[in-house]
Amino acid sequence: GTELEVKVTGVYLEGLKWMKFSHDALKAEPKKNDDGEIVPNVFLLKIAPDAPLGIHKAWIGGGKFGSSNYRSFVVGDLPEIEAGAGGASMEKPFEMEVGQTALGKAPAGKYGWFKFAAKKGQRILAEISTKDIDSKLMPSTALFDASGLQLDNDPQGGLLDFTATADGDFFVRLNDFLYKGGDDYV
């Protein structure tokens, strides 16, 4: 289980009072400041230890315009790290370890670069999960070795399946297929 703060953004959110989920193991309550006043559009989400892994749905409502449509999100068991837009170049990548989930958003007109180490014979699956969470990002990915040689790519799917042929550092390049980006490209 875990707890985290969720900030809801968008239009027509005046008077937002609740956040509900597709499973009872997920609960949220409005965040309050030190004076006990509700912080607008911010909720404290509690995920129970027995919450099922996978895709869940969230709704918000209680304001002037009733309930929202649902938005999907993932409950996972891998450590999560904030990657922002990834590294700006292969020379300055965002470094991560195999077995981590990177969270971030794609910048418009740019690549995000990620670096990881792998051992010879180690199979690596790098998946960019966007369709299941209603992201506008259409992932285009490519995998490179330390010399800059492209080893694999998936121009419109977001899945790289790779077995390292030698110990070393490897790089994933990510961008939107149409080079779009911003807050909705997560």
Regions found by a protein language model. Give the residues of each.
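A short beta-strand micro-motif common to beta-rich folds, especially ectodomain repeats
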Residues: 51-62
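Short intrinsically disordered coil segments
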Residues: 60-61, 86-91, 155-158
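Acidic, Ser/Thr/Pro-rich low-complexity intrinsically disordered segments
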Residues: 2-31, 36-40, 49, 63, ...
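Predominantly extracellular/luminal regions of secreted and cell-surface proteins
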Residues: 70-98
